[in-house]
Amino acid sequence: MNETRWQRWAAASGFVALAFGAAAVALERPWPSTSDPDGFPAFLAANRGAILAQSMLFVISAGVFMWFLGSLRSFLIEAEGATGRLSTLAFAAGMIGYGLNVVGQAPQITLTLPSAAGMAPGSAAVLTDLGWVMLIVANIPLAVMFFAVAVVSLRTRVFPVWLGWLAVLAGAAAALLSFAVVDPSGPLAPQGWASYLLYPASIVWLVPAATVMIRRIGRRPAATTRPELTERTEQLIR
């Protein structure tokens, strides 16, 4: 198998990450409120298997997406050239964001262990909130990742212009989701109406982005910076 084909398979890992993430979402259950934790013991006893499976699927999804990030970095840096500052920033921010997604599953996995059977309801609620906060904080580096991808895309046309603007929207959605900690029971909370509108933004970018990468790898010339876009796109990351 030649190098180009390997690179295309690496880009296709974005679809694999999405599939694992979708399977994890399908296992979602309505959790008891952490402000009234008395329902946690019964909930955890009844849903232990689903909770553990969901966490492991999310962990695998995040791990596969880290693999995709390596392919994304190579794709961007070939077009950006020079030091590849923004391509490296996108890669590093994405690794931090999805690393936090992996670590954020640890509290939920802990709740499925045998030692958690005798855990006080209040302690279970604290662990649940801890995992949730980790996942919310992860949106900050993910927003940086999307904005960096957007700037490279709009400067070099390595992705179509419309896909660059989708990256801007995905970054804005991630930034907004980070404000969920301000009102944990508000519309940005995990099961709030606004979160259902904002979380899919990254998927709306990922599917066409991975498709474009697969099609262009190995048969596109290195793009060049468009001076007329430089000033405007720099403003996106200020």
Which ranges hold each PLM region?
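Hydrophobic, aromatic-enriched alpha-helical segments typical of multi-pass transmembrane helices
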Residues: 1-238
